[in-house]
Amino acid sequence: GIPMESVERSEEILRDVRTTISELVVDVFYKVLADCAKEYDCQFSAECVAPTMVSDGLLHYQMVDLPMGEFWLNSPTHDKLNDMLDAVSGAHIYGKSIIQAEGFTEVRGTWDEHPGMLKALLDRNYALGINRLFYHVYVHNPWLDRKPGMTLDGIGLFFQRDQTWWNKGAKALSDYATRCQALLQYGHPVVDIAVF
């Protein structure tokens, strides 16, 4: 844009606008949802809105009971590393013990994933700090005589009974994830350094 008065003054105004938007997102969206959840004795889980819109990627996690991020599989155009880092950091800052991840989202599914590929990515995100995984997505297939089922138009992990490795590796991967999560939820994070 064109600077108003000076570059410094324009930056001050832009910062004020962005801060106002971030605070409004918390006050009129996350806080309202948190209040509704409390009213009905429910827990509130939410993912980060940044960087898809102007917002503070950490600020709204103070309102949620269960912070959540997202990591993607083979989708570099959509994976946002700070999404998981915001969830992990937000949980640590606001004292939340469960850190969830919508995991293995894929934008152009090719049915080439396998448990070894998934485990490596899962381990990386456990190391970042998550301790509860939600698979994105289990493909719905109500038919026993048709394959592959309803795939959400190629978005998401094809984690379902018609996968060629389903009977060879899915249970082992799920059992592994369950054990890791139990241990990670039992423990307490130790963070040696803070970066802001």
Residue ranges and their predicted role:
Residues 1-67, 72-196:
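Carbohydrate-binding surfaces of carbohydrate-active enzymes
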